[in-house]
Amino acid sequence: MKNVKQEAPASKGRHLILGIFGILLALSGLFLAVAGTRLITLGGSWYYLLAGLGMLGSGVLYIRRKPAATGIMALVMVATVAWALWEVGFTFWPMVPRLAPFLVIGLLASLLHPWLTQGRQRAASYTGSAVFAALLAVGANALFTPHGVLEGKPLPVAQPGTDIPQEQVADWSHYGSNPAGTRYSALDQITKDNVDQLQVAWTYRTGEIAEGASEYQNTPIQVGNTVYTCTPTSKVIALDADSGEQRWMFDPKPHNIKTWNRCRGVSYYEPAKVEHPLVFTDLKPAATAQAGVCARRIVQVTMDARLLEIDAQTGKPCEDFGDKGAVDLTQGLGKVMENVPYYAYTSAPTVSRNLIILGGWVFDGRSTDEPSGVVRAFSADTGELVWAWDLGNPAITKLPPEGQTYTRSTPNMWSSPAFDDELGLVYLPTGNQQPDFWGGARPELTEKYSSAVVALDMATGRERWTFQTAHHDIWDYDVASQPALYDVPDGKGGKIPALIQLTKRGQIFMLDRRTGQPIADVIEKSVPQAHAAGDWVAKTQPYSVGMPTFGAQPLTEKDMWGATFFDQLMCRIDFKKLNYHGEFTAPSTEDTLIYPGYYGGFNWGGAAIDEKSGYLFVNDIRIPQVVKLVPRDNVDLSHLKSGHGVGSTYPMDGTPFVIDHKSFNSPLGIPCQSPPWGVFAAVDLKTRKQVWERPAGTVEDAVINGVRAKLPIPLGMPTLGGGAVTGSGIVFYAGTQDYYLRALDMATGKELWKGRLPVGGQATPMTYRSPETGRQYVVIVAGGARQSPDRGDYVIAYALPEKE
């Protein structure tokens, strides 16, 4: 009998490990090869097929324990490095899914190679292992370093930390700090040198947690020693500016509020301080109020469309305003309810002189028969209607004739206007006409007002000029940001009164606010001409080539991203399947990519301007969207009658289609294009050049498919809200996906400090100095980051430590 040589247990274990590694490698290669073949049929890159075949072959050789397995894998890795450099150069985040998996494979292959060679080449293998381990360590460390940073140059700040005389301290009495909407405060007690000493001075909790689609996005205002805030369901709260203690709360008890509850701000009116009140001969005179009663007023609009005035001192309704303190805003609108409100108010009302100027929010994507986008002005003293601007019928200047309504479904103004008291103009950022993604039935008269900036005469409500930012908008490119007013150099030693308008397209338009003519060059460019049946598209669209553009570069297959090469490949396949020919590719019956997406670019947070340096501060969103027009005959409409839609479907009643829409995400639930998905940035309005940029926030608190990241990796996340800038050269911002209030150097963009919040914030911070203690505070509302499961009801004030 022959002796049978028994295989050593150690050898069996090694063979098993080699086999498992080979199987995993072969399966990965098979996936890449099969999916890569599909990509090729769509006109995409050949890399994945070739790399997949190489990995498949190497995996089979590992299973068979052949030394050539390592060599083939090495060739695949060398080719991958060359391909990655050719596609994206040395840009870090695009490199991650291309190279990181191969660094792991390379490390394992180096460690396993001696088992294929019976111990030969052990030294070389371990050297290779060390190299791959070092590269992985360097790469892992680089994950926590901001990339794509453009750093600005320091600017001198004159006499920081000085005490501005109290009579020169302006209250933060408007939503955007001032009528110009610059979100600027001259306060400089908190400086770049001491901002790292900020601590929580007080915290107030409203007791109301926003649920469902509701959000707590409020920016408080401050007048004297009182801070005023409002909750998503329209409660108004007055707080002591030094202690945060509640002075009063007013609950208007709105009815039938089931969705989209928001209150981004309240406004302030003090009749005695109006310098140039408008005189209205056809209105009844203001009632003579009891001395001290409603001498100072808080103006609020509820989610059920009531305009209110409340005594700023007591929190009680001002009985001489409207009907015992309230005006019904649904008058003249026609039908506004169908299970859910089709008309509401989410932004702060605008108080200009002795007027309250209002637009309104309408439910996107529902119908061609939605409430009017009429803009109205009411007497801040009596609540009477002073004028109305009906975009579809200029003949209506107050209430519509009996039995009629304001023109239905005209473009609306749901954001915040700015106003120039000297010019007597109010500037309206308008939305696009309903229903957002199909415009075949839109009247010609109202087309020019869609997604535009419109200047109205403050006294009469008559149009002075209009500038459109997107022609025949069928992409939901509402002008969401409040206009910012600032005087820019004319190059001749003088100044031009400018209006700076951010848009969802990532374009920044700089206009002469007297005439609406561009100051920075704007040109019309040709855009794709295909469109859905019954609709049409404009031949050209306006591009602000005289100002920097953010996040608006056309996407290509190379821009697709993923956490691994698997989901990156799937994103590339999905991208090639989409109907996309660049910006302004019109929605169609195919899946159509919209980029910049309809969240932005720049959304409702708006810009901040340092009035000393002329720096403009912005934050954006870079998330593509996918839409599809579905013929109405192919859809079960019974699901859509409530007006809520099903999932990501809107009914668009009155059109031939319903609309499906969603974010363009990978199978792992992350955006398909490379980071950053949101940035902070600054533009010098004098030179019209970008001066700095940095990714906005980290994934630390992001929840993806139910898993919390918990890693402060600064990918640059989508942003909401806006920034506030101080006279000491600090920009405060909190609208990131992670839970921090940040302080940035306005000149360089460098992060100076960040304070941890209990939940995320979507609101714009504000700052003020207490007239009682002289202490400067920075206040932020933390109600929860967008799409975060963590909700809150916090109003938090930060300040420097009190002096002993």
Predicted regions and their residues:
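Topology signature of small-to-medium multi-pass alpha-helical membrane proteins
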Residues: 2-153
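Hydrophobic or amphipathic alpha-helical targeting/insertion segments
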Residues: 104-117, 122-145, 150, 238-246, ...
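N-terminal pre-domain segments of enzymes
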Residues: 129, 138-186, 541-566
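Repeat-blade elements of multi-bladed beta-propeller folds
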Residues: 172-176, 213-233, 260-306, 341-368, ...
